[in-house]
Amino acid sequence: MTSMPVDVTKRKWVVAITKLLGLLGLAGLLYPLLKYLSPSKEARAQGGPVRVDLSTMKIGEQKTIVWRGKPVWVVRRSKEDIARLPSLNGYLRDPLSTIDQQPSYAKNINRSVRPDFLVLLGVCTHLGCAPTYRPEPGAVDAAWPGGFYCSCHGSRFDLAGRVFKDMPAPTNLEVPPYRFEQDVLIIGEDVAAM
């Protein structure tokens, strides 16, 4: 039996083509998997900053904007509302916002960058209910100074989102990161991002 010479060049081509087809097959399997695991355009947009024009917002008005699937409240406060805030300090659990759940620029009596605009997450810090905006003094009871009232368990917050003493909510309403460009509010970007 005589052995025929083996053509090594053909064998190398077959091995190279087999490897190439294997890599293409692997890429074909990995692409849909990676596409499935990456967030969609809608999800990326939902997590990004939200721009809100506040130029037409009237004093006393509240707007609700959805950011990252949560309601964000924007309230335009009157000068009287702002002037009343210091008089409530003795009735509040954390009047100076020492418990850290807001950006440093919101650690003031107004809990805001601009005193006339309050920006809060509209989620009660007790069990995640949605408090209602009740700005009129006396709207909940005779001693009510105006603010936010959570009807789930009775938590009360003033017009800076600060919780009153002896309420089920353990902390003030949260302040999301935000900044202003004139009368445009940008929720999701800190003042430091400017």
Which residue stretches match the model-derived regions?
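Active-site-proximal structural scaffolding
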Residues: 23-26, 171
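Generic detector of short, well-ordered, non-transmembrane alpha-helical segments enriched
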Residues: 9-10, 65, 120, 146
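Extracytoplasmic/periplasmic/luminal assembly and interaction segments
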Residues: 60-108
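Pocket-edge structural micro-motifs
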Residues: 54, 67, 75-76, 121, ...
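Rieske [2Fe-2S] iron-sulfur-binding domain
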Residues: 90-194
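C-terminal segment of N-terminal export signals and the immediately downstream linker at the start
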Residues: 7, 16, 26-66, 70
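N-terminal secretory signal peptides and thylakoid transit peptides that target proteins
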Residues: 2-21
